[in-house]
Swiss-Prot record:
One of its GO terms (biological process) is regulation of DNA-templated transcription. Keywords: Toxin-antitoxin system. This is Putative antitoxin VapB29. SUPFAM superfamilies: Ribbon-helix-helix. Possibly the antitoxic component of a type II toxin-antitoxin (TA) system. Its cognate toxin is VapC29 (Potential). It comes from Mycobacterium tuberculosis (strain CDC 1551 / Oshkosh). InterPro entries: Ribbon_hlx_hlx.
Length: 75
């Protein structure tokens, strides 16, 4: 959905930098940041691992081996 919002200049610069660094559009970046911000107010879902019975905490972000390699390459 297309909409117009006024952002403070510092937030606009930060969002543009994130978009550039992650090779995404500004719209994709702002939508992702909004989703994360809105999700932060939701309670964390707790469940139990069926094999061990230990509690599992879902933080909503899956970190893949490729993500780790990418971060290692940046260092």
């Amino acid at each position: 959905m297309r909409t117009t919002i006024d952002l403070p200049q510092d937030l606009h610069k930060q969002a543009l930098a994130i978009a550039r660094d992650t090779h995404r559009t500004l719209s994709e970046t702002v939508a992702d940041l909004m989703r994360r911000g809105l999700a932060a107010n939701r309670p964390t879902a707790l469940s139990s691992d069926p094999r061990t019975g230990l509690p599992l905490v879902s933080v909503g972000t899956v970190v893949t081996s490729e993500d780790v390699r990418s971060l290692e390459d940046e260092q």
